[in-house]
Amino acid sequence: MTAKRIDGKAFAAGVRARVAEEVARLKEGHGIVPGLAVVLVGEDPASQVYVGAKGKQTVEVGMASFEHRLPAETSEAELLALIDRLNHDPAVHGILVQLPLPAHLNADLVINALDPAKDVDGFHISNVGRLGTGQKSMVPCTPLGCLMMLRDHLGTLSGLNAVVVGRSNIVGKPMAQLLLGESCTVTIAHSRTRDLAAVCRGADILVAAVGRPEMITGDFVKPGATVIDVGINRIERDGKTKLVGDVDYASAAEVAGAITPVPGGVGPMTIACLLANTLTACCRANGLPEPQGLTA
């Protein structure tokens, strides 16, 4: 058996098209333009690429894009003052502070200074708590993208066994909460889990978000399972740098029913869900119905 390849790039394009339709409807029906502000401190090369991609896609779906690029030596007080201005700016519906921040800045303090209603990354402690207690929240983008693909592929997730390998605040924990919200039976596995392969083999849904290249092999996969690979790792192979996931695609694809590739799987969904979250935040701020299917 060879697994179905879940094309995240194509799925993300569909999400962006849906967001663009809803943005056009907001403009025509209500004169409202959703706005996303992205804050970058310093000159980290990867962060600069991400911020550029976010700004480009924001404009492509018809939203207003506000980029704030600050020098690496920006003080905490200066950054917090900018966030306060953005919190009170009615043209800004979503705010994203690009991580990682320079070492002298307290990331938790900065993130928790955001207006939770504008926290489109879903990292504010209020949104974390709301997600954990089943209340309406802003949902972290990568887990939301995974959930969208799972819903599309499987339909109902109720009653399925799900194993999330990884317990980070950014992916593992919120992914487990989202799956629990779909009435899955959820196990969170990690570096201290005993007999990890056996735990994973019990999963109808296996989400790998552990940050170790090709750690999850076909031996970890239940026949017919759906495998979502969140990992993005750069490795040297045959004298070349290659991007691989946390799953060994070749062996896992021989066992799984469906699997996301790396690259081209979960990655493209992250920015698409950032745009979806900005749209959701805009609708909530204006007391308008949220578009269906674009949030948890």
From Swiss-Prot:
Read off the PROSITE patterns from this record.
THF_DHG_CYH_1, THF_DHG_CYH_2
Annotated pathway: One-carbon metabolism; tetrahydrofolate interconversion
Pfam families, per this entry?
A: THF_DHG_CYH (PF00763), THF_DHG_CYH_C (PF02882)
* Keywords tagged on the record: Amino-acid biosynthesis, Histidine biosynthesis, Hydrolase, Methionine biosynthesis, Multifunctional enzyme, NADP, One-carbon metabolism, Oxidoreductase, Purine biosynthesis
Q: What is its EC number?
A: 1.5.1.5, 3.5.4.9
Quote the record's binding site residues for NADP(+).
Answer: 166-168, 191, 232
Top-level taxonomic group: Bacteria
A biological process term (GO) from this entry: tetrahydrofolate interconversion
Q: Does the keyword Aminoacyl-tRNA synthetase apply?
A: no
Q: How does it assemble?
A: Homodimer.
Q: What is the documented function of this protein?
A: Catalyzes the oxidation of 5,10-methylenetetrahydrofolate to 5,10-methenyltetrahydrofolate and then the hydrolysis of 5,10-methenyltetrahydrofolate to 10-formyltetrahydrofolate.
Q: Could you tell me which NCBIfam families the record lists for this protein?
A: PRK10792.1, PRK14186.1, PRK14188.1
**Protein name per its UniProtKB record:** Bifunctional protein FolD
Q: Which organism is it from?
A: Cereibacter sphaeroides (strain ATCC 17029 / ATH 2.4.9)
Protein encoded by which gene: folD
